[in-house]
Amino acid sequence: MEIVCLDMEGTLTPEVWERVAANTGIKELGKTTRDIPDYGELMEMRIKIMSENGIKLSNVQDAAASLELLPGALSFVNKLREKFQVVILSDTFHDVAKPLMKKLGYPFLLCHNLKVIDDEIVSYEFRHPQAKKQAIESFKSLGYRCFAAGDSHNDIQMFEVADKGFFINAPLKISSKH
């Protein structure tokens, strides 16, 4: 059995936080792991900005729900499903990804969790410091062959342990280094 592990944002969907930035007019919220590779640092910055500006989880969810899949994403995932198990390994959060998972036909999603109080994102909980890498290592320990695709720094950990790894929609400044 073979599994294809895909990143979500930038690979299958636009970046949610770029839409949040556009909706709020706060440019800094549009930064992604392409700009700040340390995801913990990136999330701390986002939470601080959101708190200072009264931006709620519902605002982020509305931004996510307003996004369309990248061209060809749904047909790509459906074609993969004909021959592989498909897993979305993303550094997003369940509360943010729900509307996009619906548009993708609810593939198996492994991601992180937000801590929310009264619609305010107060913190986050990483499933594992290197969740993407850990997931693929776990699948492989069960005898699965794994293929991985993503678009940014945080996807390289998947490529290191997958049987094959591929960049999709990666900026040249990232893909040319690997």
Where are these regions (language model features)?
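Short loop/turn microsegments at loop-to-beta-strand junctions
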Residues: M1-E2, A149
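Alpha-helical segments flanking ligand/cofactor-binding loops in enzyme cores
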Residues: N78, E137, I156-E160
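Active-site phosphate/pyrophosphate-handling residues
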Residues: D95, Q134, Q157
